[in-house]
UniProtKB/Swiss-Prot annotation:
GO terms for biological process: brain development; camera-type eye development. It comes from Oryzias latipes (Japanese rice fish). The keyword Secreted applies. This is Progonadoliberin-2. Teleost species possess three paralogous GnRHs: mdGnRH and cGnRH-II have been identified in tetrapods; sGnRH has no tetrapod ortholog and is thought to be a duplication of cGnRH-II.
């Protein structure tokens, strides 16, 4: 039983790390509102301009594999 609880805890932690939650450090305000004076283009929109939209990609078989590949792609994009 304790292994199940540990596994669920690890899965919850990994899921929270891989989710696309809003972060205070990125200049967002509570409630998902942006500052009205700045007109920033989001990173997702920049990717769409180059034809790399995540919603335009064909669906992959494994949901977990999809999450891991998207996380790796974001990390590589940050390093560029």
């Amino acid at each position: 039983m304790s292994r199940l609880v540990l596994l669920l805890g690890v899965l919850l932690y990994v899921g929270a790390q891989l989710s696309q939650a809003q972060h205070w450090s990125h200049g967002w305000y509570p409630g998902g509102k942006r500052e009205l004076d700045s007109f920033e283009v989001s990173e997702e929109m920049k990717l769409c301009e180059t034809g790399e939209c995540s919603y335009m990609r064909p669906q992959r078989r494994s949901f977990l594999r999809n999450i891991v590949l998207d996380a790796l792609a974001r990390e590589l994009q940050k390093r560029k």
